[in-house]
Every structure is written in structure tokens, then in C-alpha cells.
Amino acid sequence: MSEAEARPSNFIRQIIDKDLADGTHSSVHTRFPPEPNGYLHIGHAKSICLNFGIAQDYQGQCNLRFDDTNPEKEDVEYVESIKNDVSWLGFEWSGDICYSSNYFDTLYAYAVELINKGLAYVDELSPDQIREYRGTLKEPGKASPYRDRSPEENLALFEKMRDGGFEEGKACLRAKIDMSSSFMVMRDPVIYRVRFAHHHQTADKWCIYPMYDFTHCISDALEGITHSICTLEFQDNRRLYDWVLDNITIDCQPRQYEFSRLNLEYTVMSKRKLNQLVVENLVEGWDDPRMPTISGLRRRGFTSSSIREFCKRIGVTKQENMIEFGSLESCIRDDLNENAPRAMAVLDPIKVVIENYDADTVETLTVANHPNKPEMGTREVPFTREVWIERDDFREEANKKYKRLVLGKEVRLRGAYVIKAERIEKDAEGNITTIFCSYDNETLGKNPADGRKVKGVIHWVSADKALPAEIRLYDRLFTVPNPAAADDFAATLNPESLVTLNGFVEPSLAEGVAEQAYQFERTGYFCVDSKDSKADALVFNRTVGLRDTWGKTEA
């Protein structure tokens, strides 16, 4: 990450500053603990930037820990994807990668300690009965008939669970806390359950697995985490976090702090909903450029620096709010405006024939890669008698506000000559197929000699030398700002979130590598698709338009 990216301030950093100043901690140690059951999304990026950013700014450490206690939903594929995403975002984890499964033996021992202290018991109620006995927010829970078993009996039953003596759902280990607590999480939560599932790290060693709330706090303590930072939905869980650590023999006592998660307009963040989009083929996979996943954003053309900048701009607070999608687009637009080389591409082509230009001549024009950055160099663009221009850049008649090509009037071709539309040719349906023009051969890089004003400039590519390309115009995945609030979120999908065009690009783009970004002049920012683009079949993804036009129509 660039040192030029300014250090932010927020309430968590203020807590850390105080802890360091009063000697509560001498250093800072954070962690990012994803469950490897899916692909990371832009909401995770906020947590990554917060946890790794804090460690970076305070010369501390940040662990990457996989919270892998649910083997049925986890996979090595997700482990590798998460590692790649964190690295791509510009961060390095401290030491070796951690897994909660590394601590399964230790976690088991702590569960035994709670049993010996009379603070945990094996319950043989069914999952439905446990839910029923737990009560509601308005009604206290009631004790399980198995709650008062002796430690000796519970130890024997827990060993039986470990040894495969219970079927799934027939027994679990619960913490013995308070069934009348006003906090549901404290009503004897389940801390171990039976699962006969192969684990991607421990194979078939275990048939019992610890629950998140039991595992998380102990993993933090074992790793020496000083500040355990999570989102607000875990605020009540902090009571259980502290209870577990207070009742086992362990040296480190981390503190949990909560911040508001990221809610972004025109998308969903729920893994369940994202998975539904993939499973029902409503998108083309987890890395579909319309998805809010980091891999999807990356494929669409978002840079790691733009995502870090977005996370910095939205800040870290305890207040839940909805962030405008335009804020994310603004970050990548600013980045690419500064750093993306320019190129010309015609997305909806119509042919121009310059009748007074020699048919056999191929002129090589030198064009700057960036108007404000000469250090980015130049490229060669071929100019020929026939060129493609955008269909929208020509009208038979137009008012004075239209600064493009009009029949009988002039316009400048970007980096080339002034041309004049002399006549047109139409097909049987009345559609214009060809525009016949003349050119002023004294206007390459200069104004007309007679002083006449040519105000419009349009882009173009050589019809003979341009490369055909598939152009994918990506837009917001949903038509409403908060699709998650809809009765059927899938019904709010934007049918125009992907429009595919067959256009032409200048030949220099054949050299573009996967994820290479360009500004297609006057059109938007695009990148080479990392999955489908090939040397003989180019594919470009629109990352973002030149300006925010969502919900706006042309005047």
C-alpha cells in the first residue's frame, strides 16, 4: 500500500491510541478471520483495510486466520481465493496463515475445563427443542432437563460425542450461563456439535466441531490479539466472548470492538443471496463483473488502490447507513482518469469513406497515451481512407448544441484531420450504412488555414486496421437501491446490467494484458477481460463511465 495514502482517524484508532498511551498494550495485534465458505466481497474489503491498515500504521501485526469450524460449507478453493484477494488488495499477513482448526485440541481441552467447573453440559434435546426452550426476547428460556448433570457424567458424554457415539443432532455441548438472560446469546449457547464431515485441514480426525462464539475468542487469545474488531451484528456476542475468556485458564484477554458493516446501494452482501445468484445462473459466477465480490470487481477493472480509497472515504463508525454506489464508482473513476492510458474504440460503428483520401495510403499518426502525462509516452495509430465512427456521432440534421458530425458540416477526427460529411448511403429500411466525407489535408495537428472554426472532435478507428472486439457494458446489478429489502430480491435484477456489443478497437490494444485498463476516449473506462479475452478474440469490460449518468437521460 502506498505511503501517500493518508492515515485515517476513527473511534477504533482513538481506542488504540489510548491503550498505547496508558500502557494497556505496548503494541497492536489485529486479525482478519474470514470463514472459507465463499468469496470475499466489498464489505470484507472494509474489514481487511481496517485490520491490516491498523497493523500497518501502528507497526503492529495482523493475522490472516481462517475460521474453519463448519466443514460442510468450507473448501480449499475459498481459502486460496481469500489469500489472493488479501494480497491483491495490497496487504501482507503476519507470519504463517492461521486456522481455527489448528487449535481444535486446545479448544477441546478448554471445553473439558468448563465441564469440570460445572459451566458446560451435554444436552440431548433436539435442535428444535433447544430453540423452543430458549424462549423469546419477551419470554425467558427454561432449563433443559439435562442441565444439571454432574461434571463426571458430562465428561463421559462429551468423550462419547468425540468418539462418534452420538448421531448428528442427538447431542451437543452447551455453556451453562443464564436461561433468563435478556441477551439470547447468553441462554446456554451451544459450543460444540456433532458433524460427521471431512475437514479440509484436519481430514477425519474430528466428528465434533466447536461453534464460532466459542472458537473465536479463544483463537484471539491464543494468537495474542489485542483488538478484536468485528461488525455490529456481533455486539451482543461480546458478552459471550468475555464470558468464555473469563472462565477458562488463559493469559491473554483481548477486547472486542464493533463497527458498522458496509451497506452498498444496488447490490447485496448476503452470502446466501450471492450464492443464489450464482446457483440459479442469474450471474455468470462469483467473479462475474457485476458481483460485489473482490474477484468480480477486479475482473470488472477496479484497482486495489481504488477499493482502499473507497474504504478510507466511507470511514469507520458505529452508525449503519447505505453508501451510494456512485461513491465506489467515483474512486475508480478518479484512479483511472489519472493512470489509465487513452485509446480509441468504436462500440456502435458506422463507416465513413473519405473520398478524396488515397485508397492505398496508410498513414501512421502519433498520439499521446495521456493528455496530461507525457511520461506515459505515445502510440502509433493507423489512418486510412475508410474509418469507423460511432453511430451516435452523426446526424443528418442537428441544432447548434450538437458538436459532432452533421451532413454538410465539419468535425475533427481525434488526433487526425478535419472531415466534412458530403452525402450518405442508406439501406432499404432507411438506415444509414455509409457516410461519404471529404477531408482537409492541411489540418493534421492544426486548425484550418482560412481560420474557420471546427468545434467538434470525435473518435474513430481505421476500418482496415482496427481489431474486432467484444465490448461488455456492465452496469448496476439491481434496479433499486436496496434490493435486499424486496420480497423477492431477484425480481429487482437489472435486465440491462450487461449489454454486449461488437465493436472495433485500435490495433495497439492487441498488446493489452489481462486487467489492463484503458480510457476509451469519450466513452468510458474499460479493461481487458481476464477470463475470456484472447489475442484473436479481444474482450473488454466497461469498468465505469466517464461520468455518473445513472438515472439520467440525455437532454
UniProtKB/Swiss-Prot annotation:
Q: Which residues form a coiled coil?
A: none
- Where in this protein would one find the motif 'HIGH' region, according to its record? 34-44
Enzyme group, top EC level? Answer: ligase
**GO terms classed as biological process:** glutaminyl-tRNA aminoacylation; glutamyl-tRNA aminoacylation
Could you tell me the keywords of this UniProt record? Aminoacyl-tRNA synthetase, ATP-binding, Cytoplasm, Ligase, Nucleotide-binding, Protein biosynthesis
Q: Has keyword Lyase?
A: no
User: What InterPro entries does the entry give?
Assistant: aa-tRNA-synth_I_CS (IPR001412), Gln-tRNA-synth (IPR004514), Gln/Glu-tRNA_Ligase (IPR050132), Gln_tRNA_ligase_bac (IPR022861), Glu/Gln-tRNA-synth (IPR000924), Glu/Gln-tRNA-synth_Ib_cat-dom (IPR020058), Glu/Gln-tRNA-synth_Ib_codon-bd (IPR020059), Glu_tRNA_lig_a-bdl (IPR020061)
Database matches in SUPFAM superfamilies: Nucleotidylyl transferase, Ribosomal protein L25-like
Q: What is this protein called?
A: Glutamine--tRNA ligase
Upper lineage is: Bacteria, Pseudomonadati, Pseudomonadota, Gammaproteobacteria, Vibrionales
